[in-house]
């Protein structure tokens, strides 16, 4: 029962984030779900500590978002460079991280190449 409750809570917040992403202009549910499922995998890998590490560690938050946006980008059928730039902009502006757009774009490109 504990894991099911964790999953329900995570999915509830995940759907809120998916709705917000669609509101921001994303029109591909599968890509948004790939992003949020990556966060679920991070949660599982961290033995449930993902939310705390995400909140209190900018370095962890950056790595988490790079991995999630790379998964989202890879799930699109086209590899539109404009979309990659948009994701890099969101990473640099929306996550309280001390990274520039250029740094974010370089890091995201490296994540995709790995």
List each model region and its residues.
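Hydrophobic or amphipathic, alpha-helical segments that drive membrane association/targeting
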Residues: 1-13
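Short, surface-exposed binding/anchoring microloops in extracellular/periplasmic proteins
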Residues: 23
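Histidine-centered divalent metal-coordination motifs
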Residues: 35, 39
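Helix N-terminus capping/helix-initiation residues
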Residues: 1, 57, 98-100
